[in-house]
From Swiss-Prot:
Binding site for ATP: 88, 90-91, 111, 123-124, 174, 181, 260
Protein name in UniProt: Protein nucleotidyltransferase YdiU
Taxonomic lineage: Bacteria, Pseudomonadati, Pseudomonadota, Alphaproteobacteria, Hyphomicrobiales
Catalysed reactions, as listed in the record: L-seryl-[protein] + ATP = 3-O-(5'-adenylyl)-L-seryl-[protein] + diphosphate; L-threonyl-[protein] + ATP = 3-O-(5'-adenylyl)-L-threonyl-[protein] + diphosphate; L-tyrosyl-[protein] + ATP = O-(5'-adenylyl)-L-tyrosyl-[protein] + diphosphate; L-histidyl-[protein] + UTP = N(tele)-(5'-uridylyl)-L-histidyl-[protein] + diphosphate
Listed cofactors: Mg(2+); Mn(2+)
Amino acid sequence: MAVHFPFDNSYAALPEGFFARVAPTPVATPRLIKLNRPLARELGLDPDRLDSPEGAEILAGKRIPEGADPIAMAYAGHQFGNFVPQLGDGRAILLGEVIDQNGVRRDIQLKGSGPTPYSRRGDGRAALGPVLREYIVSEAMAALDIPTTRSLAAVITGETVARETLLPGAVLTRIATSHIRVGTFQFFAARRNQDAVKALADHVIARHYPNAINTKQPYLTLLQEVIRRQAELVARWLLVGFIHGVMNTDNCSVAGETIDYGPCAFMDGYDPTKVFSSIDHTGRYAYGNQPRIALWNLTRLAECLVPLISDDQDAAIADAEAALGQFSEQFGQAYHAGLRAKLGLFTAQDGDRELIGDLLGAMIEQAADFTLTFRGLSDLAGNAETDSVRNLFAEPAAFDGWLGRWRQRTAAEPQDAATRRAAMQAVNPAFIPRNHRIQAVIEAAVERDDFAPFEELLAVLAHPYRDQPGFAGYAQPPQPHEQVLQTFCGT
């Protein structure tokens, strides 16, 4: 039987200016290298039928399934602060939408499926390395319980793509609750097309924020909800040491999901100024700058929505500014609550922020590994030996004084050691997708057509909060010769 996709397409029913209808460009000999079978079932798809020659052809864009309405979405965006009035899906094509098993509408998009009217002289293709990177990191983020796009499948095309050298081509099937970005609103606002901005806002409200429909100011409620989700999302990034790397407005999802994993990376040693992206020369998107940039992006969204918020533009601007003014508090609450949880503190007390700040300061000075420090503290909560954490600090004595204060603080709460340790282990991952591990996976796949390291890394990262003694090496930071100093978009 044919592979069946229960498409229910809504974005393609919007006016033509929202997208360009374009079919994927067929590829030579598609080979399915990874299928996310649990996600397929969640989407109402049959993984056994997808895992077939016909399925590989669909997932590579060589065959169009019944009910698909392939489109490339239009959007604009600020890239490193500079406005580009037309970007759009230059190498991605939305096949359509399905309603998943939980009643949620999800996009099915092929990334690397060929040129579109928005390709801007690009070939519309993707190389295998960036496809594997996005698959690994997006699925790791999902396992960390951070809102994110998902990866359904990765397919090798049987063709090469020209980058610095000739590289194997691949297509990623990306799943999102939508691919609507701040830049999508900017596309129409820049053209002073208020009817289109309103149609887009109405679509986003119906799709993502239906509770806004019956409020007195639905477009203000929309802005407030996007701000809240972004504040909470960026807080969660910081709590696991994640650096997005390219927080342009066209990479900012109004659904509050992490999207576009090009030059992303996770920190090893804690450093708020850390930058990995090869194109971020000024540190605009450094780890510690991410909350500020999120607010900057949200301000650009507010500018698009102000004409809809109220006929009285002075009142609309005041309302939008008040909504934006909530971001810092919302981010701060989510971030500090998360840090208290990482330290096993069940209540908020005076002095907690100083305690947290002193630990982070010592971690900066001593180049302590972010992930291992907090995971190690989880073990110390269960009365483990202190050396596993002390040895992460260049001068262990810098940690000892702080440890005494932390033990005194936790002793003021009634929870026993086992309860505290379990709570801390549930929020402090042992395993993150470390850059050197991703690089090793990519090299094995690209240079040797060996996907065993890819499969093993995915299996480990699927359970980030679980001790996995047989894979303890995956928790370790890189040796000096393994360090990855820069990451690349791969476009």
